[in-house]
Regions:
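Phosphate/dinucleotide-binding and metal-coordinating scaffold of catalytic cores
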Residues: 1-283
Length: 283
């Protein structure tokens, strides 16, 4: 993945929990997802992996670059919260090009997607446990007659709970808070045929390439503290083992029968005090 250097922070206004910023680079303006944001580097790992898998399914996503943020990168925004965020994000971050005239897509724009493309989007989001593509927030961008899938940082939730993963965990259906914007596509007669074709596109080598695109510095903060004190060589070996664990999890999830595709998702109950989690089991 190409590496660019951030030369100036142009806009640091808060834009959701991921708190991306708009920056200037030698190749133009970019939107940067920061490693120091609330979701941490795990969100950047998810963004890269899901985008790589989307491209393997011929779905439109934005090109990605790695962006170096120096501790002395100039900014005219003197907000203390932003300053803390930038300080916590020194080093490599994830960059997306800032598109001209981009806006959030609406239902009126979705005619540009074929039924098969809608099915592929639904299938991919179920595979990677992406809860963020709903009627309220489609996370689809429109620019210059083109749609792009965006914001996959909340996917791959299993990466925060490796110690509780069992042999059966990858076969769990998965849970969502709200229905997917294209949920009804799974009721079409062709769904079973489509989902089989999608699975054939995601070979083990595709999964391995997706993980190879993830920088070690994004995996490092996700390792247990007991591992971090090892030598650099041992640490790199542990990072590669963790990448292999992502591949193994997704590969097992892709094995037939794919419950995530053939069974409806489990919906979690939300209230203002806490989230009541239903167990992710096959029902």
């Amino acid at each position: 993945m190409e590496i660019i250097r951030i030369t100036r922070i142009l806009d640091g206004r808060c834009r959701g929990s991921s708190r991306p910023v708009i920056v200037e680079t030698p190749t133009g303006k970019h939107l940067i997802k920061l490693r120091g944001a609330a979701q941490g580097s795990g969100a950047l790992v998810s963004e890269i992996i899901v985008a790589e898998l989307a491209e393997a399914l011929h779905l439109p996503v934005l090109p990605r670059r790695l962006a170096i943020l120096d501790s002395d990168t100039p900014t005219e925004d003197k907000n203390d919260e932003l300053a803390d965020l930038l300080a916590a994000s020194a080093g490599l971050n994830l960059a997306f090009p800032l598109l001209d005239n981009a806006r959030d897509a609406t239902k009126k724009d979705f005619f540009r997607l074929t039924l098969g493309e809608k099915a592929a989007i639904l299938w991919l989001d179920r595979l990677v446990l992406n809860p963020d593509r709903t009627n309220q927030n489609p996370n689809i961008l429109y620019s210059e007659e083109q749609l792009y899938l965006i914001d996959h940082g909340a996917s791959l939730r299993f990466q925060y709970n490796w110690s509780n993963i069992t042999e059966e965990t990858p076969s769990y259906v998965g849970s969502m808070f709200k229905p997917h914007i294209f949920e009804m596509v799974s009721e079409y007669p062709d769904w079973v045929h489509w989902e089989s074709l999608f699975a054939q596109c995601l070979t083990r080598s595709v999964l391995e390439r997706a993980l190879a695109a993830v920088p070690s510095s994004f995996i490092y903060p996700l390792l247990p503290d007991t591992i971090l004190d090892n030598s650099l060589e041992t640490l790199e070996n542990n990072i590669q083992r963790r990448k292999a664990a992502y591949v193994a999890f997704l590969w097992k999830r892709l094995k037939f029968p794919r419950n995530f595709a053939l069974e409806p998702p489990i919906y979690q109950e939300m209230n203002t005090s806490k989230i009541q989690h239903k167990r992710l089991t096959n029902q």
